C-alpha cells in the first residue's frame, strides 16, 4: 500500500512539473521539467532524510552521550523487531519528535530537547514507539519525500513566473507565457497542499495504536500527546515555521495556530487521538491493571515527585545523566524491566 502511495506521489510530482513546464515553455519546457522532476525524485529518494535532519540541525547521539534516551529507542526497536535506527536530538524548546528514512534499515528518529525535558521516560517511550510504528509501516519514505517535494512545489511559482516572463518576450507567445506563469503561481501553493494531503491522516491513528502496542501502554502516549499539545503550540518553532512543508513529519503539528481537526489538517485533533488511545487502554485494561498503569477509576496512576529517582533506570544504582540528558526525564518509579538498565547484578557483586 505504501509502495503504491509513494509511486503515486512521485508520479503526481512529475506530472505537476511537466504541466507547469508545458504551460510556460511548450513542448521544450515540458521536456526540461521532466528531466528536472526525474532528478529531484532520484535525489529525494536517497537524500530527503538527510535534508530534513540538517534542516532542523539534528545531531546524532549514542549510548554514551544520551544513554537513557538511546536505550529507550534501542529496546523499543528490539520489541518491535526493527533494526536499530539512528538517534538524533534537536536543540529546540518545542516538545516534538519525528522519524525519517527510506526504509527500516536506513531509518532515524529525532526528539527535541523540549520533549526530553518535559516528558517522563514512559512518555518518551510512548512517543518513540509511535515513531517506530511509522518506520514499521514504512510511512517514513512517503512522509520524507512529501516534505522535500512539497517544499520544491512552493518554488514552482517563482520558476513559472520567471520562465513565463522569458517566453512572453517572444513574438509568438504574445504574452501567453506571463499569463501561464501567473496561473502557475496561483496553482502551485494549492498543489503543494494536495501533496501534503496525499499522506492520509489515518496513518497517525495507526501509528498511535501500533506504538501503544510496542511500548505496552496506550496511556504513556496519551499522556505524552497531552503534554506536547499543551506546551507545543506555545513555543515558537522557527525552523518549522520557515519550512511548513515538513509539518506533517512531526508527532504533533509544530506550526503555531494549528491543532483543530479539519479537512486540510496534517494531523488529527490531539483530543481525538487521546480518546482513541484511552479506548485502546480500556481494551487492554486487565493487562494494564496488573502492571500498575491503570487505576480503578479508569485513569493512569500518578506518582508524586518525592517517590521519583533515577535509580530505577539501573536497578538501584545512582544514575548519572549523559551530556545531552541533564535536566531531562521526569523521574518515575516502577518501570517495566525493559525500561531499566539491567546491570544491577554487576553493581552488587
From Swiss-Prot:
One of its GO terms (molecular function) is metalloendopeptidase activity. It is found in: Cell inner membrane. Binds 1 zinc ion per subunit. Keywords: Cell inner membrane, Cell membrane, Hydrolase, Membrane, Metal-binding, Metalloprotease, Protease, Transmembrane, Transmembrane helix, Zinc. Zn(2+) binds at residues 130, 134, 204. Its cofactor is Zn(2+). Its EC number is 3.4.24.-. It is a multi-pass membrane protein. GO terms for biological process: proteolysis. HAMAP family: Pept_M48_protease_HtpX. PANTHER family: PROTEASE HTPX. This is Protease HtpX homolog.
Amino acid at each position: 500500500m505504501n509502495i503504491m502511495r509513494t509511486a503515486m506521489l512521485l508520479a503526481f510530482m512529475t506530472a505537476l512539473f511537466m504541466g507547469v513546464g508545458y504551460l510556460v515553455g511548450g513542448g521544450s519546457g515540458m521536456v526540461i521539467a521532466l528531466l528536472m522532476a526525474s532528478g529531484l525524485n532520484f535525489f529525494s529518494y536517497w537524500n530527503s532524510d538527510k535534508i530534513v535532519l540538517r534542516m532542523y540541525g539534528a545531531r546524532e547521539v549514542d549510548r554514551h552521550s544520551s544513554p537513557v534516551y538511546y536505550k529507550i529507542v534501542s529496546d523499543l526497536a528490539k520489541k518491535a523487531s526493527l533494526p536499530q535506527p539512528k538517534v538524533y536530538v534537536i536543540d529546540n524548546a518545542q516538545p516534538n519528535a519525528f522519524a525519517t528514512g527510506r526504509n527500516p534499515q536506513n531509518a532515524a528518529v529525532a526528539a527535541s530537547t523540549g520533549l526530553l525535558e518535559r516528558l517522563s521516560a514512559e512518555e518518551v517511550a510512548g512517543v518513540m514507539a509511535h515513531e517506530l510504528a511509522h518506520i514499521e509501516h514504512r510511512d517514513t519514505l512517503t512522509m520524507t519525500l512529501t516534505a522535500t517535494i512539497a517544499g520544491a512545489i512552493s518554488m514552482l511559482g517563482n520558476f513559472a513566473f520567471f520562465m513565463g516572463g522569458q517566453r512572453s518576450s517572444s513574438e509568438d507567445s504574445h504574452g501567453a507565457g506571463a499569463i501561464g506563469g501567473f496561473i502557475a503561481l496561483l496553482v502551485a501553493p494549492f498543489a503543494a497542499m494536495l501533496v501534503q494531503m496525499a499522506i492520509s491522516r489515518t496513518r497517525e491513528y495507526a501509528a498511535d495504536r501500533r506504538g501503544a502496542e510496542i511500548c505496552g501502554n496506550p496511556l504513556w502516549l496519551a499522556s505524552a500527546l497531552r503534554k506536547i499539545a499543551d506546551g507545543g503550540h506555545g513555543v515558537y518553532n522557527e525552523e518549522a515555521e520557515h519550512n511548513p512543508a515538513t509539518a506533517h513529519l512531526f508527532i504533533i503539528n509544530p506550526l503555531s495556530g494549528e491543532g483543530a481537526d479539519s479537512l486540510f489538517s496534517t494531523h488529527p485533533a490531539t483530543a481525538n487521538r487521546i480518546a482513541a488511545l484511552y479506548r485502546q487502554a480500556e481494551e487492554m485494561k486487565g493487562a494494564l491493571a496488573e502492571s500498575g498503569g491503570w487505576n480503578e477509576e479508569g485513569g493512569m496512576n500518578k506518582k508524586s515527585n518525592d517517590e521519583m529517582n533515577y535509580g530505577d533506570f539501573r536497578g538501584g544504582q545512582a544514575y548519572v545523566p549523559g551530556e545531552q540528558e541533564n535536566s531531562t526525564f521526569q523521574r518515575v518509579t516502577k518501570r517495566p524491566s525493559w525500561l531499566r538498565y539491567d546491570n544491577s547484578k554487576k553493581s552488587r557483586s
